[in-house]
């Protein structure tokens, strides 16, 4: 795989000297990927083990810790939308990434202080004591400040890096290759964090573990800044949301106007006629008296829009139903991330006589399987499908496959948890602890299945948004997936709270609960959501599906 990238780099650089002069191209690849690697190691280094840190060092109850972690994850996923707007509208991607990486560095450094200074943490719980000292307001204030800074910095770089990296290339094929490497590096870095850093936190010290995250963040910041002279610096095109609002207002102003079938009646710049879908908004581009200056420019953008603006608006509208389906796809995954850690804490995590798997490291199974199947998909499955059918596997098809794997994973996890609860009911524990005499390895199969699903649906969602959104919203487009996932973390937090209020399935001690029933509810919801997604996919028509090396497909079968 690495040799493929090297070959692409040599070809691209030698074939297009003009790219060198204006920046961009494969010469930027090592800087972008190294930055991504360091920032992701830093972010996952503290985030993956946050639940355990809150429980062990800040005496937070297990379900409450899981909900806090979900809220933090949701914030990290929502910040990319703000970063994208700042990039598209005001500053460009490169400055936003630089500032965000520095903010992340400050947050992780402060979090390291909470681990190293005893005054910033409550006293640990005494052995066999039910009552534990709660953290003070000052201690919580410092902790939440650190988490907030780290979350803002992480969110500000996550998908902005994807856009900045893709913007360095002219060809769709090269952009697609970068996206594959982007996700591969993301999950590889997560795997490094989930093993080396989480193990350090659990078995050596939290200070050293968080310190390694600080070092990784500092390294990535230096690498990114040092590569600035090679980058293609994208110019902000103004707020894309203003353009979308103009379409709405212009269409409403002309709501009584008759939609014309004559292209001369529309203000066009590149597209001559608006499409027939969402015909009401075609009125926004309908020319009326004194709306166009003699030089052909628009007098008032809130009264008249171009056909291109109208079609860009329609593109965003078409994506919304699919985004809703993704919310219900990712909510179970968000819940599983939290509940798996709690399950791992009450299962036998021993491997051999002296090694014990950290509960926060369980997610490495998902990360590794995602990494592996991104490569398998890119090099084996997708080329085989193309050779077999003569068509590319579309982004929506990839997302649909991810839906199916997600449902399967929830079902398998429910079966595993039911087996664990039977062992608990029989009183089979390790010694006098509350740890069931059941190996944590039973959780590996469902985690692998989740990883396979993510290898399909996550890159598929990002590719869909990047290719279907207007060019002026490229940064916003790649952040949409992150925003949807952020909503999912909030949804999962609300769902956990609802289940706690209405059932006895999720007590603080899950040995006395029914987590398996929670997973079965998620399976039912997943099946219904898959049906909804298939209907939306069947009705959707691609706007920009193309490949540089093949003829463009006018109609794509879903």
UniProtKB/Swiss-Prot annotation:
InterPro entries: MFS_trans_sf (IPR036259), POT_fam (IPR000109)
Transmembrane segments: 31-51, 63-83, 90-110, 140-162, 178-198, 204-224, 319-339, 357-377, 399-419, 440-460, 479-499, 518-538
Induction (free text): Not regulated by light or plant N status. Up-regulated at the protein level but not at the transcript level by medium acidification.
GO molecular function, one term: nitrate efflux transmembrane transporter activity
Location relative to the cell: Cell membrane
Keywords tagged on the record: Cell membrane, Membrane, Nitrate assimilation, Transmembrane, Transmembrane helix, Transport
GO biological process: nitrate assimilation; nitrate transmembrane transport; response to acidic pH
Disruption of the gene: reported phenotype: No visible phenotype.
Gene Ontology cellular component list: plasma membrane
Pfam families from the UniProt entry: PTR2 (PF00854)
Tissue specificity of this protein: Expressed in shoots and in the cortex of mature roots. Not expressed in root tip meristematic cells.
Activity-pH dependence: Optimum pH is 6.5.
Principal location listed in the UniProt entry: membrane
Topology term for the membrane: Multi-pass membrane protein
Disulfide cysteine pairs (residue numbers): none
Task performed by this protein: Transporter involved in a passive nitrate efflux. Not competent for chloride transport.
PANTHER family in the record: OLIGOPEPTIDE TRANSPORTER-RELATED (PTHR11654)
Membership in a protein family: Belongs to the major facilitator superfamily. Proton-dependent oligopeptide transporter (POT/PTR) (TC 2.A.17) family.
Protein name listed in UniProt: Protein NRT1/ PTR FAMILY 2.7
Organismal lineage: Eukaryota, Viridiplantae, Streptophyta, Embryophyta, Tracheophyta
């Amino acid at each position: 795989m690495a040799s493929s990238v090297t070959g692409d780099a040599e070809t691209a650089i030698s074939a297009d000297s003009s790219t060198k002069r204006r920046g961009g191209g494969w010469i930027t690849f090592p800087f972008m990927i190294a930055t991504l690697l360091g920032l992701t190691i830093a972010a996952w280094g503290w985030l993956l083990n946050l639940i355990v840190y809150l429980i062990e060092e800040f005496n937070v109850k297990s379900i409450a810790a899981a909900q806090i972690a979900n809220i933090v994850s949701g914030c990290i996923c929502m910040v990319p939308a703000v970063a994208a707007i700042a990039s598209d509208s005001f500053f460009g991607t490169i400055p936003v990434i630089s500032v965000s990486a520095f903010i992340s560095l400050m947050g992780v450094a402060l979090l390291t202080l909470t681990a190293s200074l005893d005054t910033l943490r409550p006293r640990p719980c005494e052995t066999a004591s039910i009552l534990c000292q709660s953290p003070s307001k000052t201690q919580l204030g410092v902790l939440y400040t650190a988490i907030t800074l780290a979350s803002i910095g992480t969110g500000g770089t996550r998908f902005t890096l994807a856009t900045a990296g893709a913007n360095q290339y002219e060809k769709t094929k090269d952009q697609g290759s970068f996206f594959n490497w982007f996700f591969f590096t993301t999950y590889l870095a997560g795997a490094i964090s989930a093993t080396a850093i989480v193990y350090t936190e659990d078995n050596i010290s939290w200070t050293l573990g968080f310190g390694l995250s600080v070092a990784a963040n500092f390294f990535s910041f230096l690498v990114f800044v040092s590569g600035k002279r090679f980058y293609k610096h994208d110019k902000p095109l103004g707020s894309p949301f203003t353009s979308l609002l103009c379409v709405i207002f212009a269409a409403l102003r002309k709501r009584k106007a008759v939609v014309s079938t004559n292209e001369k009646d529309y203000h066009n710049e590149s597209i001559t006629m608006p499409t027939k879908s969402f015909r009401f908004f075609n009125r926004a581009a309908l020319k009326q008296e004194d709306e166009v200056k003699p030089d052909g420019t628009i007098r008032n953008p809130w009264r008249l829009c171009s056909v291109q603006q109208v079609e860009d608006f329609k593109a965003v509208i078409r994506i919304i139903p699919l985004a809703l389906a993704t919310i219900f796809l990712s909510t179970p995954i968000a819940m599983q991330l939290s509940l798996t850690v709690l399950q791992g804490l009450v299962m036998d995590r021993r491997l051999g006589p002296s090694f014990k798997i950290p509960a926060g490291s369980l997610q490495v199974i998902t990360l590794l399987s995602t990494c592996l199947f991104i490569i398998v998909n890119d090099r084996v499955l997708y080329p085989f499908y193309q050779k077999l059918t003569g068509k590319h596997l579309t982004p929506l098809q990839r997302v649909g496959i991810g839906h199916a794997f997600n449902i399967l994973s929830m079902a398998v996890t429910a079966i595993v948890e039911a087996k664990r609860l039977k062992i608990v009911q029989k009183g089979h524990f390790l010694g006098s602890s509350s740890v069931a005499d059941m190996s944590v390895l039973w959780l590996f199969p469902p985690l692998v299945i989740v990883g396979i699903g993510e290898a399909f649906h996550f890159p598929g969602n990002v590719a869909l948004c990047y290719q279907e959104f207007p060019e002026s919203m490229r940064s916003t487009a790649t952040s949409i997936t992150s925003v949807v996932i952020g909503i999912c973390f909030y949804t999962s937090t609300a769902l956990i709270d609802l289940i706690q209020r209405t059932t006895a399935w999720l007590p603080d001690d899950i040995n006395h609960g029914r987590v398996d029933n929670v997973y079965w509810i998620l399976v039912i919801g997943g099946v219904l959501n898959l049906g909804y997604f298939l209907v939306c996919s069947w009705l959707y028509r691609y706007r920009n599906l193309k490949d540089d090396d093949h003829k463009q497909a006018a109609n794509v079968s879903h």
